[in-house]
């Protein structure tokens, strides 16, 4: 099919350039209900995304683009019609002209596959989760997915790259059945490789968290507190913090920060070093065909680099570093045990963290947390916290302990000092 698509694109004289993304996914899926296997399924899909570029205007000063998907085999006439429709739509888009990424022949990257059968792997992971259950806390449902995905991109400038990667996704719903009511949580986990010791820890935490949810009470008489974030919330914090430093953000003037400007002023805590990296060696290129290599965005609390797509890099006159999926940050000097030695709020479930550099705001709505008053750990819920982002960054504490997941490498926890509790 990909040859047919490329031939049809080349046949249309109004197509100034093109990009084809072919994604083949082989997914092994297992569904468990009340800790018993219900259904197994194997799904194989092959999908194409075709982006058509059309230069127009005086001296071809503008380039428009339009994308369409192909999920089934099309006749030559159907494909030609889709391309013509995309060209028509692209005529109405007036982006500043830019060049597609240039390539030089085929290149392929591939992660080594697991030797065990995917269903055996998923059963082992599920049974490790179920082993953490107690008489009153168990997993009402668990869905397990093993996906091996091959992505190939070709463009009109000679790019022809292919990468094959695998991952395991788990969606677990732990529940706690108490004498008064039943409560549930939803927990998502992604693994690059099979590490049953890590799975065992994740399962134990999920069961402990749902028990905390059952016992949680309204937080009262705590107007201010240090807040500890962990897990996905740390990743979200870092992504929010550097989100405006993309080429796109700089071009659209979403930030006024220049290279060398301080992100943290008057640092009293840990200086931040944040960047983007590859999830694996096979994660070698981005959606445009830009070759990826680790890049630093913030170093020692200062902005040292932008990042982002080929298009907006050209608008800024910069060499593109690409669009990444995995963020990384340097660890701090403080152990988690030391972080937790003083009174604090440890966030277990957060609806999302919000950061606005220009209004100076940081905050979030908390669904579940643990309040440590210096003596007792008390599960609490139904509140929010907020504070000044500049002050929070100045006093920021990063844990010495780190995690390395698919989308995040860095400190396991961070501590935000003196947040207002609402």
Task: Locate the predicted segments by residue.
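Acidic low-complexity segments
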Residues: 2-7, 15-28, 76-163, 201-235
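Dual-mode signal for accessory low-complexity, basic/Gly-rich regions
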Residues: 259-422
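N-terminal alpha-helical targeting/anchoring segments
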Residues: 27-88
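Structured beta-strand/loop patches that form or line metal/cofactor-binding pockets in enzymes
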Residues: 16-49, 141-161, 287-288, 343-366
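A generic local secondary-structure boundary/capping motif
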Residues: 9-10, 37-41, 128-133, 156-164, ...
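Short His/Asp/Glu-rich catalytic/ion-coordination signatures at enzyme active sites or charged loops
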Residues: 61-72, 103-119, 171-175, 181-200
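Extended amphipathic alpha-helical scaffolds
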Residues: 23, 31, 124-201, 248-275
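Short beta-strand elements
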Residues: 44-58, 161-191, 297-299, 366-373
């Amino acid at each position: 099919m990909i040859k047919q698509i490329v031939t049809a694109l080349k046949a249309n004289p109004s197509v100034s350039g093109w990009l084809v993304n072919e994604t083949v996914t082989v997914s092994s899926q297992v569904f468990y209900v009340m800790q018993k296997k219900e259904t197994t399924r194997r799904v194989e899909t092959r999908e194409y995304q075709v982006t058509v570029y059309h230069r127009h205007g005086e001296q071809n000063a503008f380039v428009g683009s339009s994308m369409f998907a192909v999920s089934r085999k099309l006749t030559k006439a159907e494909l030609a019609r889709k391309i013509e429709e995309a060209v028509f739509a692209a005529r109405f888009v007036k982006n500043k002209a830019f060049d597609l990424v240039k390539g030089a022949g085929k290149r392929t990257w591939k992660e080594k596959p697991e030797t065990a059968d995917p269903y055996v792997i998923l059963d082992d992971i599920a049974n490790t989760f179920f082993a953490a259950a107690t008489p009153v806390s168990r997993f009402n449902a668990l869905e397990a997915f093993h996906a091996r995905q091959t992505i190939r991109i070709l463009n009109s400038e000679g790019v022809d790259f292919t990468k094959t990667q695998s991952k395991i996704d788990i969606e677990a719903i732990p529940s706690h059945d108490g004498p008064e009511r039943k409560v549930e949580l939803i927990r998502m986990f992604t693994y690059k490789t099979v590490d049953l010791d890590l799975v065992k820890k994740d399962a134990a935490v999920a069961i402990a968290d749902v028990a905390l949810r059952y016992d949680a009470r309204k937080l009262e008489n705590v107007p201010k507190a240090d807040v500890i974030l962990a897990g996905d919330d740390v990743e979200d914090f870092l992504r929010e913090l550097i989100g405006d430093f993309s080429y796109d953000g700089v071009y659209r003037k979403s930030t006024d920060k220049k290279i060398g400007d301080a992100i943290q002023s008057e640092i009293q805590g840990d200086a931040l070093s944040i960047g983007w990296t590859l999830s694996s060696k096979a994660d070698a290129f981005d959606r445009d065909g830009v070759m990826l290599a680790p890049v630093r965005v913030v170093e020692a609390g200062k902005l040292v680099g932008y990042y982002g797509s080929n298009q907006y890099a050209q608008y800024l006159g910069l060499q593109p570093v690409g669009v990444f999926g995995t963020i990384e940050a340097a660890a701090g000097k403080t152990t988690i045990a030391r972080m937790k030695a003083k009174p604090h709020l440890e966030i277990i479930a957060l609806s999302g963290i919000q950061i606005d550099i220009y209004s100076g705001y940081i905050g979030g709505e908390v669904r579940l947390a643990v309040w440590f008053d210096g003596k007792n750990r008390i599960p609490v819920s139904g509140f929010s916290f907020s504070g000044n982002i500049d002050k929070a960054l100045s006093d920021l504490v990063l844990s010495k302990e780190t995690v390395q997941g698919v989308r995040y490498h860095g400190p396991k926890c961070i501590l935000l000092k003196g947040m207002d509790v609402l």
